[in-house]
Curated annotation (Swiss-Prot):
Keywords linked to the UniProt accession: Electron transport, Heme, Iron, Membrane, Metal-binding, Mitochondrion, Mitochondrion inner membrane, Respiratory chain, Transmembrane, Transmembrane helix, Transport, Ubiquinone
Membrane-spanning ranges: 33-53, 77-98, 113-133, 178-198, 226-246, 288-308, 320-340, 347-367
Gene responsible for this protein: MT-CYB
Protein name according to UniProt: Cytochrome b
Topology of this chain in the membrane: Multi-pass membrane protein
Record-listed heme b b562 binding positions: 83, 182
Binding-site residues for a ubiquinone, renumbered to this chain: 201
Lineage: Eukaryota, Metazoa, Chordata, Craniata, Vertebrata
One Pfam family cited in the UniProt record for this chain: Cytochrome_B
Quaternary structure note: The cytochrome bc1 complex contains 11 subunits: 3 respiratory subunits (MT-CYB, CYC1 and UQCRFS1), 2 core proteins (UQCRC1 and UQCRC2) and 6 low-molecular weight proteins (UQCRH/QCR6, UQCRB/QCR7, UQCRQ/QCR8, UQCR10/QCR9, UQCR11/QCR10 and a cleavage product of UQCRFS1). This cytochrome bc1 complex then forms a dimer.
Species for this entry: Akodon serrensis (Serrado Mar grass mouse)
Length: 379
């Protein structure tokens, strides 16, 4: 078996990626989230496939088809809630994975990091089009509000919006194409994941100390397969607890009402994992400015490798940047809270301050602290 896995053309690839892969001996539990994201993607594709068997992408029957899945399909309610809450678990793991990358300086592996940003954007797009499919009130108005933002693009904006809608409003054509996008995008994500892993295994993984670990490597299996299994069980425990005990806690009550183009909800708000970006969008009074800030709030992650001037890898021995990093996390949580609040004082003012702080930390404070710490080392 050992000879087969090392010589067989297909098994050899799996062997070099998951069995005999030389891995730093000191990587912590923060490195578990990559495998957990792969698990989340597998759960989402599997549950999504079963949901697609019973769902109809037509404005007249979409809402009732979701109700039919929950009421009449064997364990349909479980599949639906695993899929809905699986998306939340996916984004929790994604945020932690990106946060770990920032904290431990994984962005220096620029190819892996940039593919990761593409994965992040693709996952956000998938979640957005998926949220429209149940055709509830918040689904409909979320689709209307967010797609309408494209009209801020000069010259081609209005044409682009009508092209995406497939008409002059969000209607049957929009729902059909969103279902098509939602079905195909996870497979595109899976392809990008393979590219992400390919680039990662070209350079080898980073480690918590930020030091070169070439002299201290251990095989991935059995050490990290067992360690990843613990993460898998904890994730499944959290997901099953959410799906079985609190299935609707992260959803919006407005989505229990069928979509009505003549009745606007009191507060149109996206899913919780988009609230930080939504708060940044709302904090700028100008429409085009808001859209640019929204896009930049994600694309600014690509600036980390460019703005990094530190002589050290990661933040483990850098107390000043550590403090700035945790202020950044607190600011992100504040933006998430603000995104769910109504557009009125003092929430708008707090949102504007937090949005400015978000960009200042990444563009100014972190590079400045890098320079200060470099000078301290020289002393």
């Amino acid at each position: 078996m050992k000879i087969l896995r090392k010589n067989h053309p297909l098994l050899k690839i799996i062997n070099h990626s998951f069995i005999d892969l030389p891995t730093p001996s000191n990587i912590s539990s923060w490195w578990n989230f990559g495998s957990l994201l792969a698990l989340c993607l597998a759960i989402q594709i599997l549950t999504g496939l079963f949901l697609a068997m019973h769902y109809t992408s037509d404005t007249t029957t979409a809402f009732s088809s979701v109700a039919h899945i929950c009421r009449d399909v064997n364990y349909g309610w479980l599949i639906r809630y695993l899929h809905a809450n699986g998306a939340s678990m996916f984004f929790i793991c994604l945020f932690i994975h990106v946060g770990r990358g920032i904290y431990y300086g994984s962005y220096v592996l620029s190819e892996t990091w940039n593919i990761g940003i593409i994965l992040f954007l693709t996952t956000m797009a998938t979640a957005f089009v998926g949220y429209v499919l149940p055709w509830g009130q918040m689904s409909f108005w979320g689709a209307t509000v967010i797609t309408n933002l494209l009209s801020a693009i000069p010259y081609i904006g209005n044409t682009l919006v009508e092209w995406i809608w497939g008409g002059f409003s969000v209607d049957k054509a929009t729902l059909t194409r969103f279902f098509a996008f939602h079905f195909i995008l996870p497979f595109i994500i899976a392809a990008f994941v393979l590219v992400h892993l390919l680039f990662l295994h070209e350079t080898g993984s980073n480690n918590p100390s930020g030091l070169n670990s070439d002299s201290d490597k251990i095989p991935f299996h059995p050490y990290y397969t067992i360690k990843d299994l613990l993460g898998v069980f904890l994730l499944l425990l959290a997901l099953m607890t959410l799906a079985l005990f609190f299935p609707d806690v992260l959803g919006d009550p407005d989505n229990f009402t069928p979509a009505n183009p003549l009745n606007t909800p009191a507060h149109x708000x996206p899913e919780w994992y988009f609230l930080f970006a939504y708060a940044i969008l709302r904090s700028i009074p100008n429409k085009l400015g808001g859209v640019l800030a929204l896009v930049l709030s994600i694309l600014i992650l690509a600036a980390f490798p460019l703005l990094n001037t530190s002589k050290q890898h990661g933040l483990i021995f850098r107390p000043i940047t550590q403090i700035i990093f945790w202020i950044f996390i607190a600011n992100l949580l504040l933006l998430t809270w603000i995104g769910g609040q109504p557009v009125e004082y003092p929430f708008t003012a707090i949102g504007q301050i937090a949005s400015i702080t978000y960009f200042i930390i990444i563009i100014i404070l972190m590079p400045v602290s890098n320079t200060i710490e470099n000078n301290i080392i020289k002393l």
